[in-house]
Amino acid sequence: MDSQRNLLVIALLFVSFMIWQAWEQDKNPQPQAQQTTQTTTTAAGSAADQGVPASGQGKLISVKTDVLDLTINTRGGDVEQALLPAYPKELNSTQPFQLLETSPQFIYQAQSGLTGRDGPDNPANGPRPLYNVEKDAYVLAEGQNELQVPMTYTDAAGNTFTKTFVLKRGDYAVNVNYNVQNAGEKPLEISSFGQLKQSITLPPHLDTGSSNFALHTFRGAAYSTPDEKYEKYKFDTIADNENLNISSKGGWVAMLQQYFATAWSPHNDGTNNFYTANLGNGIAAIGYKSQPVLVQPGQTGAMNSTLWVGPEIQDKMAAVAPHLDLTVDYGWLWFISQPLFKLLKWIHSFVGNWGFSIIIITFIVRGIMYPLTKAQYTSMAKMRMLQPKIQAMRERLGDDKQRISQEMMALYKAEKVNPLGGCFPLLIQMPIFLALYYMLMGSVELRQAPFALWIHDLSAQDPYYILPILMGVTMFFIQKMSPTTVTDPMQQKIMTFMPVIFTVFFLWFPSGLVLYYIVSNLVTIIQQQLIYRGLEKRGLHSREKKKS
């Protein structure tokens, strides 16, 4: 096997992976689009008592910090809209990215409240509480680091329930604190809950689609417990009424999409019930309900939780709840992508440009892999040196395949040649390549990150296809510089078109990934020359053998 055959192997592996990825994405039929409404929100089955009754009409209040622009409904105190001012909807757009939405076409809300036997959000106790607020708009002022939004409700028995949203400057974590004052003569049994609900089918204005060659990031629900650090839960599974229903101390529930997430993390010493529910009308939910607590007459009880609503910034999410940072979708190669991203982020702290950081990390990765690359080229050179002997053996033994195989293995052993020596380094490089892809597609830090000149977004494709063409040119030079023993006409034609095939593949790839591959190819050219010089001194390579 030689380096040109390696290109063919890479192509076959790559195409196979893309076919598998597409099959994974499409094997489950998507639910039919339905008109979403706000009237059916009671969870079915085992989660029935955790459902949230219809919100009805309340007043919408505005809550703004430097990084969050929330709309909260005083009926129940749900967050019905969340805008992220620091993240434009599109490149060069003045409109902020909208994470939570309540519209006739799409629903994505963060609900919370107090249920249980005496909770005001218990459907058996009537409509959801209509909270009183002091004003219609709350804004984090200059020089202010914390913003509190208190909402109060007093039931018919005189019990007072206070729900306070606490937001901090530069923070996407929102603390939701409950205060229950029992004015009656009997204990109040109260449970807190947090629920995320979302339309399963994306409307046209949100479903941007993707090219056939792009990897898809996960969109759906997820949860974490002390026993299961991170588990995804597909919307399709919820739509089929195969729902989650587990108890856990600690943990969180979340809904995920590319770059952004929402999550509820309860703060209590008791047990929480984690559940999913098909709410009907094409809406799925995931949530938690806490273990009931008793608030004695004349006493005050407190319960707390945290809502994350924003970008998937790993270090900040990890500070909110254990393992919440795992929601960044790096796919099945997360164990490679995560350390690569940490290294990339460390490099970026010095150079200040994600594109140059990718270039530097490419040199680092290829430098670490240089011994494997050298072993690969040495193994291929030895295989080329044995070709005359192997050809003579084939002519001597004719069609006796068994004897040919036996004598070839004996020859490899005598010459200390591993026939698979050229494949192993290739198998090591492929997961790293794919892990980099997952990292670029899943890291919000690279979303709309500029590089230089015409590359204004490293997570998007090159608008002028210059980088893919340059990548194809570097592949062409590598191919021309590499010795070959390929004699089959069909294989020769395939080898000739490999740079073109790869260029077409990479037209739709993120610019950051294409940049990595260009730099990696340039490093290959340099390393190739250094290795060939060493092989020439050992008599394992001759420039006359190169195919021009």
Curated annotation (Swiss-Prot):
Pfam families the UniProt entry points to: 60KD_IMP (PF02096), YidC_periplas (PF14849)
Spans traversing the lipid bilayer: 6-26, 350-370, 420-440, 458-478, 499-519
A GO molecular-function annotation: membrane insertase activity
Xref: InterPro entries: Membr_insert_YidC, Membr_insert_YidC_N, YidC/ALB3/OXA1/COX18, YidC/Oxa/ALB_C, YidC_ALB_C, YidC_periplasmic_sf
Keyword field: Cell inner membrane, Cell membrane, Chaperone, Membrane, Protein transport, Transmembrane, Transmembrane helix, Transport
Ranges of biased composition (kind: Low complexity): 30-50
Region (Disordered): 28-55
UniProt record, GO biological process: protein insertion into membrane; protein transport
Location, primary (coarse class): membrane
Topological type in the membrane: Multi-pass membrane protein
PANTHER family registered for this protein in UniProt: CYTOCHROME C OXIDASE ASSEMBLY PROTEIN COX18, MITOCHONDRIAL, OXA1
Subunit relationships: Interacts with the Sec translocase complex via SecD. Specifically interacts with transmembrane segments of nascent integral membrane proteins during membrane integration.
NCBIfam families (alphabetical): PRK01318.1-1, PRK01318.1-3, PRK01318.1-4, yidC_nterm, yidC_oxa1_cterm
Primary role: Required for the insertion and/or proper folding and/or complex formation of integral membrane proteins into the membrane. Involved in integration of membrane proteins that insert both dependently and independently of the Sec translocase complex, as well as at least some lipoproteins. Aids folding of multispanning membrane proteins.
Name this protein carries in UniProt: Membrane protein insertase YidC
Native species: Shigella dysenteriae serotype 1 (strain Sd197)
